[in-house]
């Protein structure tokens, strides 16, 4: 018999329909995506229709893994996370392969994963989404720390250390909604790792990547904090066969705080970025700002009323950095309190097919600081 960690009382099945509707409207675990690209292609519903028997409350790594692997009906599952879960269960990872075998958490189709406490957090683990129709809400993800970084002498002019595993990877999946999720290096910031071969020894990879034909993704009211290479949308210039016409992603009302680069870095995708707040400095000792939007091969970025408070930056070339792209459109954004002016060809060739509500740029910072991230749902 498959374990169930939390089910609704049997009597609840017999309450009046009006009460059921009232409860459903008030329960964030039952909500579906209402903004951005995740509303397209039939919408993103996750486990919003899960049977009571397929609703789990988990407090440990073992319970979380069991809930993710459980056999459920066609309406999917809801997994409610309570408190801080250490996926390593107190046993440090010794190698990259050891980390992969114990830390990876695959999220199946029609799943809603939601934190139900203000401190709901995943540590020493990472999520992988290769299945369609997934919702992740109201949790903190401490970016994974690879114990075995690899030196690449050909990475950059002086070589670099590289590591594996992102906090969340969306690979080939369609219809994914990430809402009120905080990504952070947390307890292991990059200044703690020392140097080798004359370069900082980097134990982190990305925070969140969307790649290999993934599509119809919305990131809303989330927070990315204290990280170097943040969000990659499209993983390779040579992936046109899988990525062209896909990688449709919306990021809105989201905080990027002390992020060095890739906020996001885009290839191929029609990516809509609106009402986001970026704050940082080129002189930050741990996470110096390099660029925000990486304009890569065949990318089609629409940036709209974003706010960039970045000390040390005075022009668009550091906001929209050229990584082989040819078009980029910005409308109404602010850089350090002044209108952002870019010289890019703005003919991106598409407009958002969904309706959305825009804040004026002067209201973005206050809105995002008050509402974005885990614990603010």
Curated annotation (Swiss-Prot):
The keyword Calcium applies. It is found in: Secreted. Its cofactor is Ca(2+). Residues 185-206 are annotated as: Disordered. InterPro entries: Pec_lyase, Pectin_lyas_fold, Pectin_lyase_fold/virulence, PEL. Pfam families: Pectate_lyase_4. GO terms for cellular component: extracellular region. Pathway: Glycan metabolism; pectin degradation; 2-dehydro-3-deoxy-D-gluconate from pectin: step 2/5. Keywords: Calcium, Lyase, Metal-binding, Secreted, Signal. It catalyses: Eliminative cleavage of (1->4)-alpha-D-galacturonan to give oligosaccharides with 4-deoxy-alpha-D-galact-4-enuronosyl groups at their non-reducing ends. GO terms for biological process: pectin catabolic process. Residues 1-26 form the signal peptide. Plays a role in bacterial invasion of plants. Belongs to the polysaccharide lyase 1 family. This is Pectate lyase.
């Amino acid at each position: 018999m498959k374990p169930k960690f939390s089910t609704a009382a049997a009597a609840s099945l017999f309450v009046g329909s009006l009460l059921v509707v009232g409860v459903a409207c008030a329960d964030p675990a039952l909500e579906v995506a209402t903004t951005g690209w995740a509303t397209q292609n039939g919408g993103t519903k996750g486990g919003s229709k899960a049977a009571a028997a397929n609703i789990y409350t988990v407090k440990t790594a073992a319970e979380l893994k069991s809930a993710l692997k459980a056999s459920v009906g066609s309406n999917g599952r809801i997994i409610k996370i309570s408190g801080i879960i250490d996926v390593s269960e107190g046993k440090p990872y010794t190698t990259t392969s050891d980390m992969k075998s114990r830390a990876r958490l695959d999220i199946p189709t029609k799943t809603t994963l939601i934190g139900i406490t203000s401190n709901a957090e995943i540590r020493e683990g990472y999520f992988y989404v290769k299945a369609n129709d997934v919702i992740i809400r109201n949790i903190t993800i401490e970016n994974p720390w690879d114990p075995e970084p690899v030196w690449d002498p050909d990475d950059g002019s002086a070589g670099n250390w590289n590591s594996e595993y992102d906090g969340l990877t969306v690979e080939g999946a369609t219809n994914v909604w990430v809402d009120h999720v905080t990504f952070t290096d947390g307890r292991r910031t990059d200044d703690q790792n020392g140097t080798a071969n004359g370069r900082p020894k980097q134990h982190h990879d990305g925070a969140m990547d969307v790649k290999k034909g993934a599509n119809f993704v919305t990131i809303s009211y989330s927070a990315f904090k204290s990280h170097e290479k943040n969000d990659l949308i499209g993983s390779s210039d040579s992936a046109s066969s899988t990525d062209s016409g896909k990688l449709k992603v919306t990021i809105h009302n989201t905080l990027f705080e002390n992020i060095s680069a890739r906020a996001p870095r885009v290839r191929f995708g029609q990516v809509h970025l609106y009402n986001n707040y970026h704050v940082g400095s080129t002189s930050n000792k741990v996470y110096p700002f390099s660029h925000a939007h990486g304009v890569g091969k065949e990318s089609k970025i629409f940036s709209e009323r974003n706010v960039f408070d970045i000390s040390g930056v005075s022009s668009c070339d550091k906001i929209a950095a050229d990584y082989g792209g040819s078009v980029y459109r910005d409308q109404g954004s602010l850089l350090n309190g002044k209108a952002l002016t870019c010289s890019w060809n703005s003919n991106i060739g598409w407009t958002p097919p969904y309706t959305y509500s825009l804040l004026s740029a002067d209201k973005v910072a206050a809105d995002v600081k008050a509402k974005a991230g885990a614990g603010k749902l």
